[in-house]
């Protein structure tokens, strides 16, 4: 979309995209070139992924003593909320190097993000990329302002408000590229959320598999502050590793039967691409719980984990739910080791009722 040459493709043929940070670095380099009298239509920068990548200039405007350049972000075949957004850099000569955030770039208000509180939410790798890019052009001190028009509105669709990044988006990226279907930005924000919780003194967090699960978890665990609740999606393994790294002592995993069933099957990435629910496992748990022959026959034809939940409820088989969460907890605890302590709770779909939790059901209200 914004590049003069086709972006690279992965082994499956999907287009690789480029991070907000890579676009910001390319925009800053183009603006620095324009400060020296050039009018670049294309600039290339070095990506941490290991190659030089050209970027096409979308906007170049001389304003006062500086130059504004805009690039259109192309996230490839894994579009995120910033796909198609304009990433701008305004660059001018200064007495010393300064990197600032402009319109649509958030400000860090809580510790734990790797960026000092009060600074623009431009992560360490993009910061380095920006300065390396402009240093290819000039050694003179520069003031660089990164902006994302419309970023404040786009940020409402991200985890930034929960992370304490206010007023706009984060400038992210560790490699400069967005791998198709990696959901790398979301994964990174989930890991950051764990770090923010710990940096603000929390030793116990609740990791939920979705927005609905999070609402249920907040009712089940009223002793936890809002910051402790982290919507992890499919990334339970990432949450546990992040918790271990920063010293979180307790992780309470709260979810519905589809995701919890995958955890019970030993999966630490529960996206559909990571495999289907093991219905044979659920059938064996139903048998262990004492299901009637009629229920077992119906379960043998079931196509979803939800149907197993319905059958267990109809039969009054609380043991099915207990054994399921116990198995999930044991698999997750074995995966991460002794610390953090892992607790798993299963809710229904509609009322947020806790059907079972292991090993400390008494902690969960309802």
Curated annotation (Swiss-Prot):
This is Cobalt-precorrin-5B C(1)-methyltransferase. Belongs to the CbiD family. It catalyses: Co-precorrin-5B + S-adenosyl-L-methionine = Co-precorrin-6A + S-adenosyl-L-homocysteine. The lineage of its organism: Bacteria, Thermotogati, Deinococcota, Deinococci, Thermales. Keywords: Cobalamin biosynthesis, Methyltransferase, Plasmid, S-adenosyl-L-methionine, Transferase. GO terms for molecular function: cobalt-precorrin-5B C1-methyltransferase activity. SUPFAM superfamilies: CbiD-like. Gene3D superfamilies: CbiD-like. Pathway: Cofactor biosynthesis; adenosylcobalamin biosynthesis; cob(II)yrinate a,c-diamide from sirohydrochlorin (anaerobic route): step 6/10. GO terms for biological process: anaerobic cobalamin biosynthetic process; methylation. Its EC number is 2.1.1.195.
